[in-house]
Swiss-Prot record:
This is Catalase HPII. Its EC number is 1.11.1.6. GO terms for cellular component: cytosol. The gene is katE. It catalyses: 2 H2O2 = O2 + 2 H2O. The keyword ATP-binding does not apply. Heme binds at residue 377. InterPro entries: Catalase (IPR018028), Catalase_AS (IPR024708), Catalase_clade2 (IPR024712), Catalase_clade2_helical (IPR043156), Catalase_core (IPR011614), Catalase_haem_BS (IPR002226), Catalase_immune_responsive (IPR010582), Catalase_large_C (IPR041399). GO terms for molecular function: catalase activity; heme binding; metal ion binding. Belongs to the catalase family. HPII subfamily. The active site is at 90, 163. It is found in: Cytoplasm. The lineage of its organism: Bacteria, Pseudomonadati, Pseudomonadota, Gammaproteobacteria, Pseudomonadales.
Amino acid sequence: MSEQNNEQRSQAAGTDTVDRGNSNAKLEQLEAYREDATGEALSTNTGTRIADNQNTLKAGERGPSLLEDFIMREKITHFDHERIPERVVHARGSAAHGYFEAYEDLSDLTKAGFLAEAGKRTPVFVRFSTVQGPRGSADTVRDVRGFAVKFYTDEGNFDLVGNNMPVFFIQDAIKFPDFVHAVKPEPHNEIPTGASAHDTFWDFVSLTPESAHMVMWLMSDRAIPIAYRNMQGFGVHTFRLVNAAGESVLVKFHWRPKSGTCSLVWDEAQKLAGKDPDFNRRTLWEDIEKGDYPEWELGLQVIPENQQDSFDFDLLDPTKLVPEELVPVRVVGRMVLNRNPDNFFAETEQVAFHVGHVVPGIDFTNDPLLQGRLFSYTDTQLLRLSGPNFNEIPINRPLCPFHNNQRDAPHRQTINRGRASYEPNSIDGGWPKETPPAARNGGFSTYHEPVSGSKLRKRADSFADHFSQAALFWHSMSEAEQAHIVAAYSFELSKVERQSIREREVNQILLNIDPQLAARVAANVGVQLAAPANPTPQPKPSPALSQMNLLSGDIRSRKVAILIADGVAESDVSDLRDALRQEGADAKLIAPSASPVQAENGAELSPEGTWDGLPSVAFDAVFVPGGAASSQAIGADGRGLHYLLEAYKHLKPVAFAGDAQALASQLSLPGDPGVVLGATATDVFPGLRQALMQHRIWQREAATKAIPA
């Protein structure tokens, strides 16, 4: 290709960020599969160059189309078959490439090589998702979020397929189809999309007490994260680590975001679902493109094998968590996401995660939900990705070579040489051969766990307590978080048509968790509260469960809207942007229209969004610079006033400099730490920074109920 075309290619093609050293071995492997059409001739799938891609071959200008038109037939046929089955759950997702870096040598716990060397980096591909809705549903619905990480280790792929909540709705995989059928849109009318606020879901969970703990998480702020980078992640199940000596410990996996754990408010989440249904996807993409890489730390809760029976819950029960006050989280590494995919379908849509993708040193427990997942994930890929060769798809291929006697099937890419496709064989020298277990690069050896018992269908008695940890979660929340949980239950149950379902949820589930919770919800949904039948649990709160204790302590990655109009004080704009940039935060200029804005000093400012196109729900705070004419224009426009009032109602910091301080009086905003006033942007910034660090101004929440929506 010519030098000119090479230059065109570098300027016009690709979605990568500029080179920031963000390549890795997996991305280098994918390079062989990347296609770039810049400067190339249009051709058929078989390489024949196309002279006319505008017209079907016809008999005369106005005559019938001819069947011999192989170009049209190939194009239409391919188009007709472009869609593949979407995931049954977790269909709506977004993903990114990155790396995991180990902090220390964990050889005392596991022989997994990617955890056995301090500083060792392992490529990863991470997919975040919602659960209930289809591919086209909104990002900000109330739902569990999937948090799946594929480690491309030297010893094979390890998939940590988790969620942003540490527990699940059911204890046994046999109930998974029932749960999913219940939460999905109802079969008679395919309503609702991306929501659990309907009869079949609440019918199921009100009849399934084991779901009580997880539903409490679902009704909490954890179900409406502000961004993927602000989510915790959990492996959900208890796994097993095995070292080279064959010694085992039990482990819970945790991802802790460096950006802090925080969420939207419910009204904000609903508005974002309409105004920017791609909000979480867009934020992840844009942050990576501008080099503001999301980062998490990996933590382990390690439980010695001989202590697994020392808790008042069963470690094999996926509806239970291990409180950090009982078993502290040991931070062992970090994960950085630093590159976006080149093609959504080829990477994000075709990636295949599976809890059974493990490497030597990581093993399973007898968690009955985990055991069922070990079957389900492979089974579902056979349909979704058209057969058993899904591991040959580039995004799924391991970095290490793989050799076995699996053969043929649809879309086979490997060209196997030799005559023997079985083992043992003598024709090909017995290859490929088994690898004995070893401290490094050995074969996988299942942990020798003693097992005994009769064949039966029964839950262990240790799985029977369904309300203690739901109560633990409730009592660990702040007053604001508890109010949000009550509001969420009330909203969801108000959508339930059958009074009997509402009554059962309140009187048979919530009343067994906490009488005050049940009473507050009952009053909102028209249910007569029953007398408590049993004493309710009174657990000691776990501070680690409240998001109020999980903020980052800085304002990195926060986004501030700067409202501008003609006559704005340009110095306030530049000073605040500079101050935010130094803290790792970002700001965008938002104006009445996309036309350039003339500052009071004659400078021309280019808006990066409009009041209608980038509403306040897209930002963490709003700042209005000084400038008499600009402030008057904003105060005379209902859209500008709504922008500020909506941000205030959503408990966000709103800051005013110079002449713009009059807007706070015009809107009758009561004084609180989030209403920041100052003569200049420099005066405003310390208070704005402090308010941003708190995420939201929770003490304002009660007062905002008087503000019309």
